């Protein structure tokens, strides 16, 4: 169909289908050529009149200037747009503007090498398809520096947009290692990642909010302080791993938020306790490490598994090992204690889960088995954050770990990074951290 704003004569031999194909409102396709480097699309605007930006007087035509920019790939080959710009001359003698050329930012910005469609296509490829800058440069028929220099300003503007932090009610935090080089060359190896865990119509998935150099409570505290009172007052739940530094930052900056200890990190140390007891009892009874044929050594893997997943034969093997020697009673008790910690998160209702958790917090620290008592003291130290799980509908830091997985994949795809600023922008993009900003919605 014809452009609704086009006033060009139908007798000029325009092809409406070609105009529809290039999909540039207000432009006509006037020629197509195929080069070794790809397709070249010649276009011109429909505007036959233009007013001077200085005085508003209708300008006079003053020739053409051809500008070539990189377009998004067409049919799998690189494409270029050759825009035959009209040059205009102001006829008003008192006007300071003598000549000027037409501009249209839907095609390209002034003096840019990549067109708007190419930039939009590249950003979407990075965001959703796991692309790399080098791969995009090959598909566009240009260089790495050209692609990144045009994309980076949009990503930086989106990262600086305060609109990204609107509506955050649930916050998660975790760290990851972004390089394995000398710290003196690239700075801290660890980055603290802050994640929006809010779910709802406007928050379909978790998204990365920021990456901050370092791993400490001070880093997290300073980031929260920089966000402002309005942001901090909106946080209702703050999920975290059992790291006291992050807990101190939450207590200092998010006084009204409920701290929730991640369930995985509650369950994770529990299966290790029976293993420690098994090795100690093994040494006490046999005087050596576990060997093939030793009753306790044969169940070393079963001690770490959930009892609800064991077959009848595996349950029988456990009973045989527990009753093989009177000293094995410590291993059996440790095993059942660890299983109860697992069961906390598998109760029918949150009330039942909290009741079992409270009972374990009271009994485990006084257990005569040292390894279980140590586990109990650790859980008791995090009592409030542990029990808060049952008051917040099972709030978890798990989505934060999922974001870390996306970051790891992005870093492997790019074959490592050297520039921390570029790394932060790329990771924010692929983890939906910039989706809320209009700067990435070209």
Which residue stretches match the model-derived regions?
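Short, conserved DNA-binding cores of transcription-related domains
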Residues: 1-97
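Glycine-rich phosphate-binding "P-loop"
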Residues: 9-12, 104-112, 203-218
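A structural micro-motif
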Residues: 27, 257-258
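Acidic/histidine-rich catalytic cores and adjacent linkers
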Residues: 45, 54, 60, 188, ...
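Short, positively charged, Gly/Tyr-enriched micro-motifs
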Residues: 56-60, 66-171, 175-181, 232-233, ...
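A structural signal for short, well-ordered beta-strand segments and their strand-loop junctions
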Residues: 136, 172, 239, 259-262
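RNase H-like nuclease fold core
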Residues: 146-239, 244-249
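Short, surface-exposed amphipathic charged segments that create phosphate/polyanion-binding patches used
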Residues: 186-190, 271-283
